[in-house]
């Protein structure tokens, strides 16, 4: 009986690893496509400037970014999104859309996918592409 449970756990771990690999590959392909399309901001300052101008729809932070730097960047991102205003019907109205920040991939993987070196923070400029990246990750996780 105990051996059977160990075998089940091994199968589950292998399945989780395979799903993780598939999700990662699809995600990396999509951010590579975004880079080739010119729909990416590279690095912390470019991403923050893009957010302030309302041009960034998704911010990607590498999961192996040092914890202090990651926390600092998350705070800056949240602050930038909170201060984002759009002009609507002649009135300034605070943007209330979801903050799309994901922590995924390593710095090396993400940088390689977009053809740059040492880029732990990447911003996706195209709203539809950002939704596609998020949707594809969620679909893979849900098994759809």
Range-by-range predicted roles:
Residues 54-57, 97-99, 118-119:
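Short glycine-/polar-rich loops that comprise or flank the Walker A/P-loop
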Residues 2-55, 68-74:
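Ribosome large-subunit tunnel/peptidyl-transferase-proximal elements
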Residues 32-35, 52, 78, 115-118, ...:
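Signal for well-folded cores of large energy- and translation-related assemblies
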Residues 64-67, 129:
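Gly/Ser/Thr-rich loops at beta-strand to alpha-helix junctions
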């Amino acid at each position: 009986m105990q051996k059977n449970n160990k075998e089940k756990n091994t199968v589950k771990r292998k399945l989780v690893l395979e799903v993780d690999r598939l999700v990662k590959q699809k995600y990396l392909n999509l951010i590579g496509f975004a880079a080739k399309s010119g729909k990416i901001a590279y690095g912390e300052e470019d991403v923050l400037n893009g957010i302030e101008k309302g041009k960034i729809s998704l911010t990607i932070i590498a999961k192996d970014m040092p914890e202090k730097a990651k926390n600092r960047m998350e705070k800056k991102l949240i602050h930038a999104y909170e201060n984002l205003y759009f002009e609507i019907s002649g009135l300034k109205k605070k943007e209330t859309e979801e903050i799309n920040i994901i922590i995924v991939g390593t710095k090396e993987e993400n940088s390689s996918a977009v053809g740059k070196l040492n880029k732990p923070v990447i911003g996706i400029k195209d709203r539809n592409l950002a939704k596609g990246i998020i949707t594809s990750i969620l679909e893979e996780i849900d098994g759809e």
